[in-house]
Amino acid sequence: PGSKHTSSDLAWLRQQGLDAAITRHAQQGRPVLGICGGLQMLGEALIDTHGIDGNAPGLGLLPLVTQFEPDKKMTRTVATFGRVREGAWSSLSGVKALGYEIHHGQTQAHPAMLAAGAVLHEVVPGLAWQSGDGQVLGTYLHGLFENPAVLQAMFGAQVPTLETVFDGLADYIERHFEPGTLAALTAPD
């Protein structure tokens, strides 16, 4: 998931040996998802010319480079996934998701790696990228798994919205409690 200090957190991952475990997992053809700082870590390099969190080599699972910027991007975002390559994430093709971005930096394709034949698929322009084999996906979109459409696409189950859950709870309370009971239970002594 996300990280407030991407380069520092990546150094911690390396100290724990988790970088090798993530890379091995991807090399075995298993799915990897990076969100926000996780997306930045999946790239080739983190470049910090403003002294925000330091330069660092990435995990190298996506041919991307992130350049940290002093201004933080904070915005609600609605994104529709384009064609997602075959693999663990292909069910997201065409799915609309609501979320938010909150990050320092801009991420883009690593031009030298693309020139050398690396494959990168941009599934949401400027927001989500996928590896050539389809198993590694990185996105800036926080809240991905709070979207019923995303959960439906990925896991095939009807997932109720939070609003539906709260409506059900309210109905239950109305049926089983006398008016004023909850207010009396929560009133200060």
Where are these regions (language model features)?
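Short conserved micro-motifs at the rims of enzyme active sites and ligand-binding pockets
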Residues: A11, D71-K73, P111-L114, P148-A153
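Short beta-strand segments
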Residues: P1, H103, Y140
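Short secondary-structure junctions and interdomain/linker hinges
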Residues: A20, G29, L33, T66-E69, ...
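Glycine-rich beta-alpha junction loops
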Residues: L39, T66, H104-Q106, G143-F145
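Cysteine-nucleophile active-site neighborhood
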Residues: K4-L98
